C-alpha cells in the first residue's frame, strides 16, 4: 500500500495465543449437498469428515464458495479452484476474470488498452485468430464474451477472423458442443454478410487438445499447435458442425476428448493456419489451462515440443495468465491486483509456512493462494513441495491420486517443528469428480478422508490446531437435476452425469488440542464465504486480521 502509515505488523489477538501449529487443509471439490446415491461424499466411507461434521456444531460451518462470494459476476456462476484459493488467501473479494472481462466489454475499455491496439496493427493485412473454449460454463470462458468480442473487433477493422474452438463437456453437459457450434456458425454467417471473412478454422476437445496445465502433458498442447497454427490434424472437414457431429459419433467419444480437426476448403487446404503478420488472442479468462499455449505462442526459446514453424505474430491473452512470468506480455484486460494476502502478512509476522499438493493443484496452494504470485515471500521462512501427479491416465483410473503422499509430507512438516502453518490441497474430489465416474469418485473421497486423518493425527501429536475447508463443490453431486432436484435423464432414460463444479456451499471445520476452549463459530455473519477464512486463520495464529479483511468466522467466548 502506498500510504506512509501502512504497517505489515499484525496486532496480537486479545484472547488467542501465538505459537500453535496450524494445519490448513483444502479438500478440492468437496461441497455439501443432500445425501443420495449421487452424492459421492455421502456414499463414501468418510469417518473423519463425518466426525468433524457431527461432533461439535459450533466447530463446523458451511460457507459460500461461488458467485459474488468469490468475485464472480452472479450467483449463477460456479466457483472454481482459482477464484476459491484467491479468496481463501486474500481475505477479501476481488472482481475476478469473468467479471473483469464483462466490465471491460460492457464499457468498451477492452478496445482502449495497449493489448488491443497491439493486435489491431495486424487487422489491415493479416488474420485475427481467436483460440479458446467454446462454452457457456463460465469457468474458463463464456460464449457471450466471444460473441461480443467478434462484434467489437469486426467493427474496429478486423477483416479476416478465424476461430479455433475447443469443445467442453466438463463444465457443461457432454454433447452441448453441437449447440454452441451452431450458435457460433450463425454469428459468423452474419459477419460474412457484412463483408468480414469469418469462419471456424480448427477444433478439438479441451482435455485432449491445447488445454493442459502445469506442464503435465505437452502433447496436448502440441496437438492444438499443429491444428491451430500449422493447419494440420488427423481429421479434416468442410465445417465445424460436421466435424463435431461426426467425431462425437465415434465409440466412447465425448466433448472433452474430441480429437483435433481442421476445416478445409474445396481444394483440401486448411482455411486458417496462423501465418506471419497475423494476430492471435487466447479468449479464455481463466489462466491455468492457457499458460502452456501462451508459452508456445510467445517464447522464442522453447523446447517442450517441435513447433515446426513459428510465425511472426502479434499475440495477446484475454488476461495476463501468469503475473510472475509476465505471460502473456500483452493482454486485453488487466488482471485483478491482489495485494496484502494473508500468506504475505503471516510470513512477515514470523509464521514459518509449509505448502504442499500434487502437480494438478500445487499452483492453487501457492500461486493462487498468494494472489496470483509465483515464488516465495521469504525463502527463509517458507517451503513449497510439489508431489508429481500421475500422467498419461485419467484420474478415475487411480482415484487415490497422491493424497497419501501429500498427507505424509504434511505430517512430517508438522512433526518436524520447523513450521507454524502447514497448508495442503487434496485434489481427489475435484479431479476424479470431473471424470464423471461415480464409483471412482467414491473411492477418491475415501482416500481424501484418510489423508485428512493422517494430518489431524499429527496435529493432535503436536498440540496444534486444524482448519479443514474446501474451495468449491463437485463430488457431492454427480448428476444434472431439474428444478425440483430430481436427476435428469437422457433420451435413453439414463441419468445425465454432471462433471462440473456445483453451486453448493463448502464446509469449514476447526479443532485440535491447541484450539482455545472458548473458540466457536459466530452466528452474526449474514453470508459467510471463502474470503472469511483468511482472517480466521490469522486468529488461530494469535493475530488480529487487517481491518479491511472479510470478518473472521470465529469468536472467543469467555469461560
Swiss-Prot record:
Protein's cellular compartments: Cytoplasm
Domain of life, per lineage: Eukaryota
Reactions performed catalytically: (2R)-2-phosphoglycerate = (2R)-3-phosphoglycerate
Chain ranges passing through the membrane: none
Key word Transmembrane present: no
InterPro entries listed in its UniProt record: Alkaline_phosphatase_core_sf (IPR017850), BPG-indep_PGM_N (IPR011258), Metalloenzyme (IPR006124), PGAM_B_sf (IPR036646), Pgm_bpd_ind (IPR005995)
Keywords: Cytoplasm, Glycolysis, Isomerase, Manganese, Metal-binding
PANTHER family per record: 2,3-BISPHOSPHOGLYCERATE-INDEPENDENT PHOSPHOGLYCERATE MUTASE, 2,3-BISPHOSPHOGLYCERATE-INDEPENDENT PHOSPHOGLYCERATE MUTASE 1
Family classification: Belongs to the BPG-independent phosphoglycerate mutase family.
Subunit relationships: Monomer.
Cofactor: Mn(2+)
Any one Pfam family match given in the protein's UniProt record, by short name: iPGM_N
Protein name listed in UniProt: 2,3-bisphosphoglycerate-independent phosphoglycerate mutase
GO biological process: carbohydrate metabolic process; glucose catabolic process; glycolytic process
Active site (UniProt): 81
GO cellular component: cytoplasm
Positions with a binding annotation for Mn(2+) 2: 28, 81, 471-472
UniProt enzyme class: isomerase
EC number: 5.4.2.12
Job of this protein: Catalyzes the interconversion of 2-phosphoglycerate and 3-phosphoglycerate.
GO molecular function: manganese ion binding; phosphoglycerate mutase activity
Residue ranges that the Swiss-Prot or TrEMBL entry lists as coiled coil: none
Amino acid at each position: 500500500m502506498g500510504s506512509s502509515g501502512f504497517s505489515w505488523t499484525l496486532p496480537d489477538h486479545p484472547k488467542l495465543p501465538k505459537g500453535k501449529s496450524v494445519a490448513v487443509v483444502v479438500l478440492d471439490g468437496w461441497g455439501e449437498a443432500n445425501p443420495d446415491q449421487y452424492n459421492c461424499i455421502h456414499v463414501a466411507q468418510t469417518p473423519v469428515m463425518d466426525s468433524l461434521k457431527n461432533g461439535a456444531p459450533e466447530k463446523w460451518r458451511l460457507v459460500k464458495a461461488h458467485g459474488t462470494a468469490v468475485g464472480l459476476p452472479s450467483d449463477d456462476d460456479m466457483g472454481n479452484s482459482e477464484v476459491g484459493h484467491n479468496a481463501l488467501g486474500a481475505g477479501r473479494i476481488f472482481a475476478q476474470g469473468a467479471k473483469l472481462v464483462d466490465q471491460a466489454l460492457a464499457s468498451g475499455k477492452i478496445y482502449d488498452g495497449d493489448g488491443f491496439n497491439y493486435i489491431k496493427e495486424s487487422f489491415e493485412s493479416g488474420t485475427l485468430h481467436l483460440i479458446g473454449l467454446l462454452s457457456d460454463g463460465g469457468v474458463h470462458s463464456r460464449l457471450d464474451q466471444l460473441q461480443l468480442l467478434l462484434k467489437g473487433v469486426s467493427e474496429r477493422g478486423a477483416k479476416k477472423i478465424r476461430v479455433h474452438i475447443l469443445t467442453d463437456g466438463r463444465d457443461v453437459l457432454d454433447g452441448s458442443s453441437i449447440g454452441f457450434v451452431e450458435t457460433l456458425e450463425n454469428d459468423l454467417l452474419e459477419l460474412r454478410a457484412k463483408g468480414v471473412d469469418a469462419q471456424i478454422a480448427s477444433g478439438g476437445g479441451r482435455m485432449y487438445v491445447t488445454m493442459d496445465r502445469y506442464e503435465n502433458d505437452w502433447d496436448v498442447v502440441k496437438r492444438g499447435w499443429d491444428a491451430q497454427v500449422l493447419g494440420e490434424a488427423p481429421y479434416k472437414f468442410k465445417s465445424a458442425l460436421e466435424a463435431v457431429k461426426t467425431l462425437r459419433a465415434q465409440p466412447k467419444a465425448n466433448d472433452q476428448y474430441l480429437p483435433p480437426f481442421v476445416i478445409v476448403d474445396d481444394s483440401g487446404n486448411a482455411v486458417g493456419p496462423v501465418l506471419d503478420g497475423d494476430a492471435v488472442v487466447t479468449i479464455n479468462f481463466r489462466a491455468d489451462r492457457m499458460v502452456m499455449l501462451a508459452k508456445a505462442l510467445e517464447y522464442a526459446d522453447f523446447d517442450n515440443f517441435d513447433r515446426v514453424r513459428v510465425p511472426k505474430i502479434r499475440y495477446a491473452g484475454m488476461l495476463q495468465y501468469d503475473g510472475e512470468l509476465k505471460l502473456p506480455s500483452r493482454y486485453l484486460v488487466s488482471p485483478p491486483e491482489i495485494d496484502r494476502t494473508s500468506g504475505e502478512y503471516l510470513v512477515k509476522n514470523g509464521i514459518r509456512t509449509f505448502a504442499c499438493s500434487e502437480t494438478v493443484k500445487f499452483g492453487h496452494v501457492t500461486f493462487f493462494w498468494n494472489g496470483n504470485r509465483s515464488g516465495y515471500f521469504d525463502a527463509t521462512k517458507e517451503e513449497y513441495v510439489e508431489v508429481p501427479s500421475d500422467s498419461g491416465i485419467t484420474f478415475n483410473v487411480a482415484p487415490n491420486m497422491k493424497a497419501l503422499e501429500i498427507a505424509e509430507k504434511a505430517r512430517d512438516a508438522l512433526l518436524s517443528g520447523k513450521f507454524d502453518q502447514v497448508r495442503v490441497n487434496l485434489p481427489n474430489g475435484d479431479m476424479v469428480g470431473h471424470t464423471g465416474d461415480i464409483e471412482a469418485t467414491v473411492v477418491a473421497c475415501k482416500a481424501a478422508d484418510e489423508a485428512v486423518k493422517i494430518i489431524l493425527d499429527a496435529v493432535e501429536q503436536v498440540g496444534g490446531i486444524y482448519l479443514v475447508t474446501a474451495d468449491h463443490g463437485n463430488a457431492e453431486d454427480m448428476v444434472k437435476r431439474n428444478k425440483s432436484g430430481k436427476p435428469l435423464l437422457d433420451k435413453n432414460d439414463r441419468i445425465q452425469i454432471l462433471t462440473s463444479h456445483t453451486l453448493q456451499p463448502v464446509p469449514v471445520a476447526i479443532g485440535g488440542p491447541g484450539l482455545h476452549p472458548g473458540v466457536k463459530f459466530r452466528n452474526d455473519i449474514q453470508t459467510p464465504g471463502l474470503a472469511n477464512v483468511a482472517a480466521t486463520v490469522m486468529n488461530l495464529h494469535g493475530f488480529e486480521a487487517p481491518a479491511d479483511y472479510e470478518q473472521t468466522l470465529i469468536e472467543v467466548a469467555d469461560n
